[in-house]
């Protein structure tokens, strides 16, 4: 079992610096690539999930679905690894705030602000869909916005790829209720 903490080195290469976010499946850490010196993000499986093959498979699927995707509005996945029943994804560190935080701070965003962010997200999703991947959890908290107004779509944790075996049972719904497409909400997708 791997317990994420500052100073831990993954794959003899990525040193964890500080935790920056928590999710249902993992913790996201600011980390340093010891080979290049680059600061990256490391999504590390939560320790209590170590050894759980279902969650490890979801992390593998997330890495596989996001790894080859390249677009200015997608957070780039750089590496993936496993040890001791746990796993991690190394990705580009995106500096910014979740769109959900911007909305909470400012209320309704004017069209001049929100429309460019939505257009950027749509362009990212076009690349994702052309690669045969369905994100399945597009929501404001999975869109980071930097100081220059660049939006980055992240978190492919429940994504589905073409020719992949489903990770859900028939009729099982994955995603965030408020943001589900109608066909997802009814279990038809």
Q: How would you describe each model-predicted region?
A:
Residues 44-68:
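AlphaC helix of the eukaryotic protein kinase fold
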Residues 32-39:
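Conserved N-lobe loop of protein kinases adjacent to the ATP-binding glycine-rich P-loop
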Residues 121-133:
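Protein kinase catalytic-loop region centered on the HRD/HxD motif
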Residues 84-98, 102:
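Conserved short submotifs of the Hanks-type protein kinase catalytic core
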Residues 16-23, 28:
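Protein kinase glycine-rich loop
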Residues 80:
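Activation-segment/catalytic-loop signature of the eukaryotic protein kinase fold
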């Amino acid at each position: 079992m791997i317990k994420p903490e500052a100073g831990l080195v993954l794959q003899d290469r990525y040193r964890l610096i500080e935790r920056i976010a928590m999710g249902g499946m993992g913790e996201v850490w600011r980390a340093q690539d010891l080979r290049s010196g680059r600061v990256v993000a490391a999504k590390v499986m939560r320790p209590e999930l170590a050894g759980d093959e279902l969650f490890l498979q979801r992390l593998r699927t997330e890495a596989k679905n996001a790894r080859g995707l390249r677009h200015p509005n997608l957070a780039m996945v750089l590496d993936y690894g496993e040890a001791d029943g746990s796993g991690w994804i190394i990705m580009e560190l995106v500096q910014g705030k979740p769109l959900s935080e911007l909305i909470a701070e400012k209320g309704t965003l004017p069209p001049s602000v929100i429309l460019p962010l939505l257009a950027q997200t749509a362009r990212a999703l076009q690349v994702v869909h052309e690669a045969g991947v369905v994100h399945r959890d597009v929501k404001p908290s999975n869109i980071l916005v930097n100081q220059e107004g660049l939006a980055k779509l992240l978190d492919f944790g429940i994504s589905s790829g073409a020719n992949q075996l489903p990770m859900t049972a028939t009729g099982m719904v994955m995603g965030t209720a408020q943001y589900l497409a109608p066909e997802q909400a009814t279990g038809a997708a």
